Each structure stands twice: as structure tokens, then as C-alpha cells.
Amino acid sequence: MKKNLIKKCAVAAAACAVMAAGVGYYYFFSSMSKDGETHYVYVDDDDNIDSVYTKLSDVSASHSLAAFKLLTNATSYASHVRTGRYAIEPSTGALQTFRHMRNGQQTPVNLTVPSVRTLDKLAELSKRLMVDSADIAKALTSEATCEKYGYDTATIACMFIPNTYDIYWNTSVERLLDRMQKESKRFWEGDRTVKAQQMKLT
């Protein structure tokens, strides 16, 4: 009798463990995307945890959002919200999404520099970034800023090589210009004549 009772208790405990594991998997590891599609959540520098929840609720399954909130309550994320563009993918659960957002592991955007590089066109790059177009325009018309990169306000547009770049959505104006300077130097290494022909400068 006693052995049977122990056996039944062991079976019940095992069943409970399996159920708990199943529930845990469902909440923390099953797809967070509410419709099986990839979505992006943009966290601005004026967002707080409540606005993050609101943005997540538009693209997340309810059980995954509940799990995300549990993880938030168990950590200090609410007071350390990090800006960025975060992917909510079909293969990503609440736990992985939470880790990405807590650690600032965002998904870059494809930023295309047009072949027509007027200052107004370059300021429009802000449409793909968190920065404001006025901030980009201010930097490109600043003699001090242009001089820092070896240009003046009339030639700074030449630093922007037409191409598509992977860049983080929350990149600052300074980091954007640093990246463009790096890409420009890389482009012009080697045969300058060939590169100039590619750019239709000769």
C-alpha cells in the first residue's frame, strides 16, 4: 500500500513538472509575434516602461507580453529602458526578446545614401533614424563640424558615398558622420581614378 502511494505521488509530481515545463515554455519561449510575422518595436529616448508595453501590445501575443512583464518586474529593466529598433520575430519568444531589449541588442536598419546628395536630401536620412532632420542639417551646416571631418559646408556632402549601409536606428548624428567618414575613406582607398569614374566624377 505504502509503495503504491509513493508511486502515485511520484507519478503526480512528474506530471506536475511536465505541465509546469509546458506552461513555462508556452509563456517564455513560444513565438512572441501575435500573427507569426516579423514586426519591429521602436523605443525612443522619451519612452518609459509603460509606453514600451503599449508598443509591444500592438505586435505581441498576450501570453508573451505577460511573460515580458514578469521578467521586467524581476529585474531593473523598467528604470533602464534602452532605445533602439527591436525585432519581434516568429522564432523569438518573450525571454529572448526581453534579453535583447534589456541589453540593447537591436536590429540595424538599411540606410540608403542617395546619389543626389544635397544637404536637404541628406537631412532626410532621418526618416530611417531616431535623430531629427534638423539635427542632421545643423551638423552639415556647421563649419566646426565639417572642419572636424576635413570638409567645409560646401563639400561635406562628398563624404556621403551613395550606397546602402546597415546602421543602428538610434545612432547619433556624430556617430552617423563618423560612420560616413569611415566608409568614405574605405571607398577611396586604392585606385582613385577608377573610383572617381564609378562616382561619375571624371
Kindly give the residue locations of the regions a language model identified:
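Conserved catalytic or metal-liganding residues and their short signature motifs at active sites
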Residues: 1-202
